[in-house]
């Protein structure tokens, strides 16, 4: 039996696609950290599409040593004020939810305590869509090979990009319709204003004519 010799050959387009995923992967992870003073509230807002899985992990570093009864509350809401996740006295944890509509979502951290307490360090990592999927778990459940997992990621990423372009096209059409409707209203208002000015000018001419006749300035 002859053994394999030389490096493993990869198809050019497939290798390019996998390289694209490798380069895109790290940049698609969104993480943020900030300092939260005592008795203050800070919120982060993000627009997210419909029917997307959103996952996140947070960690709050308490540098007060438990002084002042310091407590930090975490709450995630949509634009209508519906609570999607809430945690009292949050320190470290994870959350997940699925969006029902395209909306603006708000993640708020609120610190409460007494006395002079050092600022807390809040670390938040949020992912949604393709980034939020656990492909390792999918590979275990569906018994996929590493290459098949990367192809699944590529398929999901392509679908996400197509959906984003479709949404942008829809928004463009809506904005164009709004612009055309606004232009039509402006045109009608301009015509109405012109007739009003013509009517006012005509009325002034007749009024002045009667006035001058009454004063016998003209015949």
Curated annotation (Swiss-Prot):
Spans traversing the lipid bilayer: 186-206
Which GO BP terms apply?
A: COPI-coated vesicle budding; cytosol to ERGIC protein transport; endoplasmic reticulum to Golgi vesicle-mediated transport; Golgi organization; intracellular protein transport; kidney development; positive regulation of interleukin-1 production; positive regulation of protein secretion
Indicate where this protein resides in the cell.
Endoplasmic reticulum membrane; Endoplasmic reticulum-Golgi intermediate compartment membrane; Golgi apparatus membrane; Golgi apparatus, cis-Golgi network membrane
**Chain intervals for the UniProt region annotation (Required for TMED10 and TMED2 cis-Golgi network localization):** 147-178
What is the tissue specificity? Answer: Ubiquitous.
Q: Where are the glycosylation sites?
A: 179
Q: Give me the Gene Ontology terms describing cellular component.
A: cis-Golgi network; COPI-coated vesicle; COPII-coated ER to Golgi transport vesicle; endoplasmic reticulum; endoplasmic reticulum membrane; endoplasmic reticulum-Golgi intermediate compartment; endoplasmic reticulum-Golgi intermediate compartment membrane; gamma-secretase complex
Q: Where is the signal peptide?
A: 1-31
Give the domain note. The GOLD domain is required for proper p24 heterooligomeric complex formation and efficient transport of GPI-anchored proteins.
The UniProt function text for this chain reads: Cargo receptor involved in protein vesicular trafficking and quality control in the endoplasmic reticulum (ER) and Golgi. The p24 protein family is a group of transmembrane proteins that bind coat protein complex I/COPI and coat protein complex II/COPII involved in vesicular trafficking between the membranes. Acts at the lumenal side for incorporation of secretory cargo molecules into transport vesicles and involved in vesicle coat formation at the cytoplasmic side.
Looking up PANTHER family in the UniProt record yields:
TRANSMEMBRANE EMP24 DOMAIN-CONTAINING PROTEIN (PTHR22811)
Recorded protein name is: Transmembrane emp24 domain-containing protein 10
